[in-house]
């Protein structure tokens, strides 16, 4: 029999259901929008031109299928606050241990990259402010947001997300206005013919087209975060399906809509690779402070990602601590405890302290290169965790716990393996680009060695 949930109650693990439906729905919308769209759209367009839209749609489709798999399992057991628990449950403690620690470490390095980005954006306005001070201040502020109450986290994330959404909608509206008025630009006139004239599927060769997949894939990274938040809503079984079902339309509106608007305004061949297309477009319509505006938007986007990372790392570390009750270190640090507000506060604080190490890493000679390598490697490990999640879903569908009247993934026998193949394809793509090649090797070594160790440890 399925479990019933009521507003304001605690989950089985003691966490308070403090998030509201509007929080999760906006997190679901904004969670797919990272700084990459605002800053990296010019670079991705330079690789393959208008066919980048196909890359975004294909990648988005497979990420949606993964979310359907995660959503189906979370719908069956809404008390699970992390999808990693299903890997433990259906693939064994060895792979669960591997996934738990790998995911936490990957998120920590993601947090380090985000806090570094935050300081870079702030220094554009205050160049003499030391980066480490900026990082510590932002980390302390966002840690407090996560420690007060889950409702406070949801409210802050709601407004962070709103800023990103309004900016993209403003770009799309600007594009529609410029096309309908035949607006004159330095490259001619705004028109949809800028996209269709001389269209080629592979304008820079098929290798560049393939390389674009790994870049776009990581633009969607952490899309699974919405699944983590639903367990702390009042009605997870009501909120989760709606949040996941609307992912495709959000991808079309925000990613495809923004890219079409940019290419209609400005021929993609003439877009500056190292400058945000958003800045270029807004400056064209007379917004002189466009660069400052977009810097503010990407600052809030990076802060939003860091906020979500602290939320997620704290809950995953709390879960790891609960599953390793014999760990002397974790017991001493009380990482498996909750605050009076039902928050894994000690796990959040510990994760924040580890992320804070990045404030000092970048000032040490030679260490920053190693940090960049590890960060690149963690991205490859992310793919391995996604694959294990899909394998866990296959096992779930064959288990006695399968819920036929739940939020079922359609045609799973075909679409689940197809999604796994796509993730493997993206992993292979990491070896095709010089900037990700070494990281891909590092990820492969980690997956093999830590995977063997994790399974050996739990086979004794």
Model-inferred region functions:
Residues 1-42, 46-51, 63-68, 79-80, ...:
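Membrane-interface "cap" regions at the ends of multi-pass membrane proteins
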Residues 4-8, 88, 115-135, 167, ...:
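Helix-loop-helix connectors at the membrane interface of multi-pass transporters/channels
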Residues 11-15, 127-130, 162-296, 432, ...:
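Helix-loop-helix junctions that connect adjacent transmembrane segments
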Residues 16, 39-134, 138, 247-252, ...:
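Extracellular loop-to-transmembrane helix junctions
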Residues 79, 102-117, 220, 225-233, ...:
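Membrane-helix boundary/coupling elements in multi-pass transport proteins
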Residues 85-88, 92, 124, 243-307, ...:
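TM-loop-TM module centered on a large, flexible mid-protein loop between adjacent transmembrane helices
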Residues 119, 132-190, 217-221, 244-248, ...:
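Membrane-interface loop-to-helix entry segments
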Residues 160, 333-345, 383-434:
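C-terminal membrane-solvent junction of multi-pass transporters and transport-like membrane proteins
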